[in-house]
Structures are given as C-alpha cells and as structure tokens.
Amino acid sequence: MRIIVADCSAEYSERLNASLPLAKRVLLIKADNSLLIFSELGSYKPLNWMSAPCSIRDITPDHADDDVDTEVPQKVIRASADKSNDVLEVTLQRIYSDESYDLGEDPGLIKDGVEDHLQKYLAEQIERIGKGAKLVRREYPTAIGPVDIMAIDGNGEHVAIEIKRNGGIDGVEQLTRYCDLLNRDPLLAPVHGIFAAQTITPQARVLAQDRGFKCLLLDYEEMKGTEDDSLRLF
C-alpha cells in the first residue's frame, strides 16, 4: 500500500470528465494499482478513483520543485484503465509524505452474526431474487471489496446483491460502486443490482430505485425456518 499526502489536483477523462482543484489530499495506491483520492470531506467514499485492472506511471517533470506558486509540479501520477481509455491524472504540486507499506494478506471482513446468516440463507435460497436465478458465489471478489452475493437471474444476466441488516443510503452507495465497476467488464455486463435487507429506509429505497436497483426485504426468521432439515431427528 502506497500512501501519499500532497497538494494535488486531478483530472479524470474519457468515460466521464471530472476534475479536482488544487488542495491537500491523501492518495492510496493499492498493490493491484487501483488509485483512490481522499480528503477530509465526505465519509469513507473517495473523491475520485481508478479501479483495477489499470497501470500506474510516475512522471517527474523537468525542473520539478515543491513550490505551489510555480507551474511545475513535483510529480504527476497517471492511472490508465486496462480495458478502456479512461485516465486519471493526478498532479502533485507539493508532496508532504510518500510512503509504501507491505500490509500482507488480509483475513477479510468478519460480519456480525445476523448479516452473515442473511447472506448464507439467501445464497441457499437464491430463487428469492427471482425464478430461475442461480448462485455464482458468495463474497465475489472485486478490486474495491467483495460483493456479498453474485448471481445469475432467470434471463442469464449477472446480479450483484448487497446485503445489510438495516439498509440505509450508505449501502446503496456501496452497491452503486460495485455495479459501476462490474459493468466495465464486458464478460460480466450487464450487471444488475439488488439491495437486500431486513429493513430499508424510505430514503434508501428511493435512491436504490432511482439507480435502477431492486429492493428485497429479508425475513430472517422465515429464511432460517426454510433451512434443509432432512438430517434433523426432531
């Protein structure tokens, strides 16, 4: 993991055009080359990012210095998507810190009991999302974290399912990021989204439906009661 603190600006081009003016920010570059830009604003969501698979180039301009009042930056980091022409270019005007760390292998997120069981039961009862649905796998890996469940619907199209105990706007945002990323892969697209939870706030439901996601209410006790009891004695 490479962590950079710098006065920087950024430009994202091709699929969409977006820019960040000069300000002090934190850049994370992960081992898979994904690049994320953070600031004090917002919550956990980066201001902008380039997801893997992508390539990273460090460019040191001629006559580079750390004077924010000059036009010559210390460094430019260019992240280029492997499967599209998307480019995220970050201009580092002044670098305060640039450190790399070997974090080793992560054991992954350990979910609380109810949420983990909801995922288990829905995976076993995947036709709850629709007739003819089939499970691909639980904890489907992506560059930005695992999708709770990846499935294929009755039409043969992929479905990413985000599961929460109590579904709020943050969960919809998380599902949005997964679907945005997965739909860039021509082998998976189109990827639809389902937001599944025991309870879903009205605001989260409106946002999910606005983004084209289906909402699915999960009855924990009822799903638990349909477990395979063929080996139970009583």
From Swiss-Prot:
Gene3D superfamilies: 2.70.180.20, 3.40.1350.10. Pfam families: NucS_C (PF01939), NucS_N (PF21003). Keywords: Cytoplasm, DNA-binding, Endonuclease, Hydrolase, Nuclease. GO terms for molecular function: DNA binding; single-stranded DNA endodeoxyribonuclease activity. InterPro entries: Endonuclease_NucS, NucS_C, NucS_N, NucS_N_sf, tRNA_endonuc-like_dom_sf. It is found in: Cytoplasm. Disulfide bonds: none annotated. Its EC number is 3.1.-.-. Belongs to the NucS endonuclease family. This is Endonuclease NucS. The lineage of its organism: Bacteria, Bacillati, Actinomycetota, Actinomycetes, Bifidobacteriales. The gene is nucS.
